[in-house]
Amino acid sequence: MKNKIHKYDFLVVGAGLIGSLTALNLCKKNFSVLVVDKNIELPKDDRTLAVNANSKDFLKNIGLWDKLKTKPSPIEKIIIKDNINSSPLIFENSYEEMGNVVFNKELLSKARNILEQKKILIGGLNIDIFNILPKKNILIKGKNYF
């Protein structure tokens, strides 16, 4: 049996939140993408993420926002304190939300589900990125990258 060779526009190394969202955005722009990670188990993570209006639009555009089961909590008030000034700086808006709070784990879970449905997520691969990078510098807009 002959091995089939797949060609991709992008290889995303790391299926964490940033890698998964990057891959979904590239797919949305009709690029072929492969996402690899050594461990694709969801982390035991109860952290939350504050999402501003632009980020919310981005998540809607890649099809994630409406898939969240837990209703995002609106941010209606922001209090900024420091140890120099005694008075806090308070931003309050009762007319519209200034952002939302979502659970990292749920966002990552939904992103990974989409990647798995598209069959572009591979786990169990420990890739040494330095072994796949070009062996010469790359010039982009007058800057050298290696």
What is the meaning of each model-derived region?
Residues K2-I18, L34:
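Beta1/beta-strand and adjacent pyrophosphate-binding region of the FAD-binding site
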Residues I5, S73-P74, I79-F146:
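Conserved N-terminal helical subregion
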Residues L11-V13, N25-R47:
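Glycine-rich FAD pyrophosphate-binding loop
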Residues S20-L21, N54:
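Short alpha-helical segment within the catalytic ATP-binding CA
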Residues N25-C27, F58, I114:
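Residues within well-ordered alpha helices
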Residues N30, G63, K119:
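Short glycine-rich hinge loops at helix-strand junctions in the catalytic core
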Residues D45-D82:
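N-terminal FAD cofactor-binding segment of flavoenzymes
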